[in-house]
Regions:
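Short, polar/acidic, helix-capping and beta-turn segments at strand->helix junctions
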Residues: 2-166
Length: 166
């Protein structure tokens, strides 16, 4: 299991989740205001190594198995080399969102809005299939294509989320 999954969440007196690992910049990863939880854009960077997730091997085994059920991580180099970056980043980002929401006592069904940024909209169909693992019910959704994302051009997907806890 990689470092990120061994990291503990950092809490502060205001019960705001600051990050999983060290943030890449000086901002809040998430903030709870009453029953609402706002998550900043989540990208597929392991905060312990600051490495961009780009391959199935960057993910834990359970993620690799989940992606196989969707037809990804086939073991065929000619297929995996093209799909792995988008599929692995999609799983990583959505799993981080799930972890943060659950740390605040919620579930993914509490997430009602996602804003998804893509460097290339051709990655959206891959992301959308992976999203169904985490959000089987429809959510309010915005999809935007952007020219670049931080920290580098390997980051293909960024997702903001908003959850409401009843």
């Amino acid at each position: 299991m990689r470092g990120i999954y061994q990291q503990s969440y950092k809490y502060f007196e205001s019960n705001v989740i600051m990050s999983i690992g060290a943030p890449l910049a000086n901002y809040l990863s998430a903030k709870r205001v009453g029953n609402l939880l706002y998550l900043s854009g989540v990208i597929a960077v392991d905060p312990t190594t600051r490495k961009v997730i780009n391959a199935y091997d960057d993910l834990p085994m359970n993620a690799q198995i989940q992606l196989q059920t969707l037809g990804y991580n086939t073991g065929q180099l000619s297929v995996d080399i093209y799909e792995a970056p988008a599929a692995s980043q999609s799983w990583f980002v959505l799993n981080r969102i799930k972890d943060i929401v659950e740390a605040e006592g919620g579930q993914m069904k509490d997430v009602f809005k996602l804003v998804q940024y893509f460097q290339d909209l051709r990655h959206y169909p891959v992301y959308n299939r992976v999203r169904e693992l985490f959000c089987p019910e429809s959510v309010v959704s915005t999809v935007v294509e952007v020219s670049r994302m931080l920290p580098n051009d390997q980051v293909l997907i960024e997702v903001e989320a908003t959850a409401y806890f009843n």
